[in-house]
Amino acid sequence: MDKLKIIMEKGTERLKRGFAKMVKGGVIMDVTNAEQARIAEEAGAVAVMALHKVPADIRKAGGVARMAPVEKIQEIMDAVTIPVMAKCRIGHEAEARILEALGVDMIDESEVLTPADPFFHIYKKKFTAPFVCGARNLGEAVRRIWEGAAMIRTKGEAGTGNIVEAVRHVRLVNENIRLIQRMTDEEIYGVAEKFAEPYLRLAFSVKEISGLPKRVLENEPIYEGFTYREIVEGIYKILLEIKKLGRLPVVNFAAGGVATPADAALMMAMGMDGVFVGSGIFKSSNPPKMARAIVEAVNHWDEPDVLAEISREIGEPMRGQAIEELQVRMEERGV
């Protein structure tokens, strides 16, 4: 890679991460039409996520969940002045290209939609639009960052109104970061090798089908022209940055199961940079009040007296689901 290309890529990554930092400390709300988008903006949302259905309805409908209709996304973009994000399926580069052409402010390569690629996520560095991606653990987070994600969010378990999986993912990432900080650089390189292994799945599957040993050559490309060793080196650099910073090098939001102001405050208390709220707003009994209360909870997460006042007379939250009752675990989608 020539020097000019390296400088341009670094500049693009800086711009993408800069946009993500602009929404830090705020609430991003899922909306399905212009009216909901205006409610979110009036409540103080820093951005909205355009979908055809909120996650709870996607879960209920079943079938294949795809990118929202172009007309719906445009309707939402025309209705508000705050940034508009939209979801594409995991690995569906064509959907992502359409969203980029529409001019959305950020693309969410999301497990809430039905995955399109069973092996890989999109190589996000090929795009000018910034991406946000979900992660259950540090390995998933680092892989997405290496691919070019400008923002990470917990996966949680979308559409359930149950915060437990988001808490699990935050704790797993935070504890793994603390472990990385206690490791030597040599030990961290071993972690990078482990974290890079999912990129080998396609190559190993093809070798197995062909009756060949499950191994790759040193110069054998396995993903977007990169060899396994090149991917390891890239992940290793990110892990060293994490060791130095004591956190992810990109903005890190909570998502998946946030249904009340208390849920939002809990996520902020656990070190999150902000909160995505999917079904929790528009599946509650009073969306405008719930939206305002969750925004206030993120702003005052460390003030219990204020949180108590915020939580008064906001109506009923969305009906929650126990994780054990779920037939589909969206959080398990992706690699």
Curated annotation (Swiss-Prot):
Keyword set includes Lipid metabolism: no
Binding locations of D-ribose 5-phosphate: D30, G159, G257, G278, S279
Entry keywords, A to Z: Lyase, Pyridoxal phosphate, Schiff base
Record: active site: K87 (schiff-base intermediate with d-ribose 5-phosphate)
EC nos: 4.3.3.6
Catalytic reactions on record: aldehydo-D-ribose 5-phosphate + D-glyceraldehyde 3-phosphate + L-glutamine = pyridoxal 5'-phosphate + L-glutamate + phosphate + 3 H2O + H(+)
GO MF annotations in UniProt: pyridoxal 5'-phosphate synthase (glutamine hydrolysing) activity
InterPro entries reported in the protein's UniProt record: Aldolase_TIM (IPR013785), PdxS/SNZ (IPR001852), PdxS/SNZ_N (IPR033755), RibuloseP-bd_barrel (IPR011060), Thiazole_synthase_ThiG (IPR033983)
Residues the record lists as binding D-glyceraldehyde 3-phosphate: R171
Superkingdom of source: Archaea
Pathway in which this enzyme or protein is active: Cofactor biosynthesis; pyridoxal 5'-phosphate biosynthesis
Single biological process term from Gene Ontology: amino acid metabolic process
Protein task: Catalyzes the formation of pyridoxal 5'-phosphate from ribose 5-phosphate (RBP), glyceraldehyde 3-phosphate (G3P) and ammonia. The ammonia is provided by the PdxT subunit. Can also use ribulose 5-phosphate and dihydroxyacetone phosphate as substrates, resulting from enzyme-catalyzed isomerization of RBP and G3P, respectively.
Membership in a protein family: Belongs to the PdxS/SNZ family.
Subunit details: In the presence of PdxT, forms a dodecamer of heterodimers.
The protein's name: Pyridoxal 5'-phosphate synthase subunit PdxS
Annotated organism of origin: Pyrococcus abyssi (strain GE5 / Orsay)
